[in-house]
Structure formats: C-alpha cells, structure tokens
Amino acid sequence: MLLLLSLVACGAEAQVRTRGIDVSKFQGTINWTKVAKDSTIRFVYIKATEGTSIQDPRYKANVAGARKAGLLVGSYHLYSSKTTAYQQFGNFKKMVKKKEQDLVPVLDIEGHHSGRLYMARVDKLLELMEAEYGVRPMIYTSERVYKTHFAGKKYAKYHFFIANYRRTPSVRYTLWQYTETGHVSGIRGYVDINRFHRKHSLSDIRMPRPKKKKSATEGEK
C-alpha cells in the first residue's frame, strides 16, 4: 500500500512539474540547448502563421532548434476574423509539416475576437486542420471567449488551452497558460509558460503515431 501511494505521489509530482512554453518572433533568437536543460520544460508551441499571409520569420529556426534540443514541438495559427477559413488553412499548411510535429496543432483565438468570431469560419478551419493533420486541433483562448462560444456540447471533444494569469481557470481546460512574464534560461525577456490540468498530461496532446504498413507476407502462416 505504501509503495502504491508513493508511486501515485511521484506520478502527480511529475505531472505538476511538466511545463511547456510558447514562442514567436518576439522571443528573438533562442538558445534551445539552454532551454532544454530545464528538466521541467518538456514541450514548446511555436507560432507558425497568422491570418491569410503572415508567417512568423523565426518559425523554421525555432522548430529545428527545439527538436534538435530534444523538446516536443507543436505549432499554432493565430486566427483572423477578416479572412476565410480556406485562406488561413492554406497559409498554415504551407508552413507546418506534419512530419515535424510532435503535438497536435493549435488554433489561437484571442480575446478581442469575442464579439465577431464568425463561428462557421472557426468550425471550417478546425475541420480543415483535422483533415490535414489527422487529429483534432487544440483551441487556445480566454475564459471569456470559451464561455461565450465553446462551452456547449459541440466542442466537448476538443482540448482547450486557456490563458489566465491571475488564477486557475474556472472552465474546462487541458493546458493552462498561467503566466506571460515567465523566465527561462536561453530566452531573453519574458515568455509564456504553460502547465497541464491535473487530469491531463503530454499523452493527451501528442500527435498519433503513423500506422505501420503491413508487409506482403504479414499474416501468412
């Protein structure tokens, strides 16, 4: 019994200590080797695109550097209410290669969109991303936007990445962006830092492993 309790406690501690960051061009040139030396930093979400045509100039270097350092990598698209889902998906697809992704893609919907989100457009973009990458995207947003647009059963199967810098989110979430003024070795200035809800872990947002193709002789006796 004592051993079981010890294992449970160790698992809970490991989950609490698993953190991730999200970065863009605003973090400048990152020393990913130094970032990876922090044993609690296991993953990173990297900005790829925004709207129809904006592509983060540090994206490719950040993906390559983070992966080389041994961090799990995911990519995010900053949603714009001014252009179509197809245009935004085309921009994201050009930049984000499935084979370079360890984590599910993220659709970033900022708080200022709350009153004019155009939900049909959001739904279509989520649909296109899922078809391309083979997994439901995670949705990043604020509690206010979640309560206004995503609280219903329609989005119950999606993982949510919620920003709240004052307190633990009061809505359903998988990832919590708990600070925008974090400090991590290897990054000059502030960086967003994220951690999991106690019921979730990295396994919940990992990309599915590709299915192995059966050989011509497999199954033969």
Predicted features and spans:
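Bacterial N-terminal signal peptides
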Residues: 1-8
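Substrate-binding cleft of extracellular glycoside hydrolase catalytic domains
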Residues: 15-30, 36, 46-126, 130-132
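Short acidic active-site motifs
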Residues: 30-31, 148
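Functionally critical loop-and-helix segments that line ligand-binding/catalytic clefts
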Residues: 16-23, 153-221
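Catalytic domains of cell-wall/extracellular-matrix polysaccharide-remodeling enzymes
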Residues: 103-167
